[in-house]
Amino acid sequence: MKVCVIGSGGREHALAWRLSISPSVTKVYAIPGSAAMSDCAELVGIDWQQSDHLISFLKDNQVDLVVVGPEAPLVAGLADVLNKVGIPVFGPSKAAAQLEGSKVFAKNLMKKYNIPTAAYGVFHKVDEAKTFIAQIGAPIVVKADGLAAGKGVVVAMTVDEANEAVEDMLSGNRFGDAGSTVVIEEFMEGEEASLLAFVDGKTVVPMIASQDHKRIFDGDKGANTGGMGTYAPAPVLTDALRDEAMKTILEPMVAAMEKEGMPYVGCLYAGLMITDEGPKVVEFNARFGDPETQVVLPLLDSDLGQIMMACATGTLTADMVKWKDSSAACVILASKGYPETSSKGDVISGDIKQYDTTIVFHSGTKLVGENYVTNGGRVLGVVGLGKDLRTALDRAYGRIEHIDFEGMQYRTDIGAKAFK
C-alpha cells in the first residue's frame, strides 16, 4: 500500500523510515518532508493546510493511508477533512485531539472518569491563580492550556517563580491564545515515563515504554525543551506497572473518549509519573512523541504499515504488535542558543549516514548545496541500537564523536536513570 506522512521533523523521519521497511508498504510520500527524508520517502511540496491540493494529490496517487506526525494538523482537524472524503488516517479527529490541544479538556475528562492525575485548578485571572498558588505552596506546576511546542510548562520550585509564570502566561501573552487559560497542578514526586499505544477507537495496544529527558542540561537542569533524548525500554515502567497504567489510564481514557462521542484513533501518548501510589498522568499527547518515536520504532518487530491501517480501519488486534528484545537510545544534538533561540545555517560536518546499529534522524536540518546545515533548535537525533541499554548508549555517543557543527550542544547523561 501507499502511505503519506505529514510533517518534516525527526519524528516524521523515523515514521517514514520505519514505514519504508514495512512489508505491506510499497511507497512512502512525505508532505512536506525534509531533504534527509528523501532516502526513505518521496517529498511532495504541498502545504497540508491547502486541503483541496492535498486531497487531489492523495486521490491522484491512490494513497491508501495518511499518517499525521505533528500535533498542529490534528488539532486543526486534518483527520476529519480526509476521513470525510474516504481517505483513512492514522491520527485522531479534531474533537479527540483536544486531549492534547487543551489541558483543561484533558484534566476535566480525567476527573470525570477517575483517571489518576495531579490535583489541579483552572484559571483565567492572575489574582485568582495567585490565591490558589498561595494556598497550595511550592513546588507547584503551571501549564498553558493550549499547544506550546512542549515548552508551556513551568515546574516552579518557589511561590515567586509560580507567580511569575502565571503573569507571564496570563498577562505577558507569552504563548498567545495557548496561554490565555492556565492549569495549576500539585507537584507529583516520582520518575517520569512515556507509554505510547496504538489505538483503533476501541482496542488499545501498548508500545514499549520509553523515558524522555526534557531539560536542556545534564542532571535535569535548565529550561524545558521539546526533549533532549530518550531510551527504551525504560526499566522504571515494569511489566506490572505498565499493566496497571493500561488498566487505570489508557484503556479507561479510550473508553471515555468513545463514550463522549469522539472515538480516539492513532497513537495515544501518556506521559506518566511513576509515584508511590502508582502511575499518574502528567499529560496526554495525541500523536507520537519526539524523540520517543526515534527509539520506539526501531524496536518494533512487526509491520508498522499494517498496524497503522488496522488502527485507521478499526481492526487492530494485540497479536499484530511484537517487539525486539533489545534496546535503543537517542541523543538530540541541538543548535547553539536552544531552547531560547536557535541558530540556523551552521554547516553540519562528519558522518550522518545510516548504519545497522546507529541511525541519524534529522529534526531541524536543510540541504544547502551538498551540505546539511542547521535549521532549527533540535537538529539531529542520533540513535544507537544494541542488545542492552549500555551498548545502545555507547553506540549513540560513539557516533556523536564523528558529528560536529558550531555551538552543538547535547546531554551526556541520557539513560543514566536506568542504571540507578
What are these regions (language model features)?
Residues 43-49, 121-125, 156:
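Short acidic-hydrophobic, aromatic-tinged amphipathic segments that line or gate anion-handling sites
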Residues 92-152:
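A conserved helix-loop-beta module that forms one wall/lid of the active-site cleft
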Residues 310-420:
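Peripheral (often C-terminal) accessory segments that flank ATP-dependent C-N-forming ligase machineries
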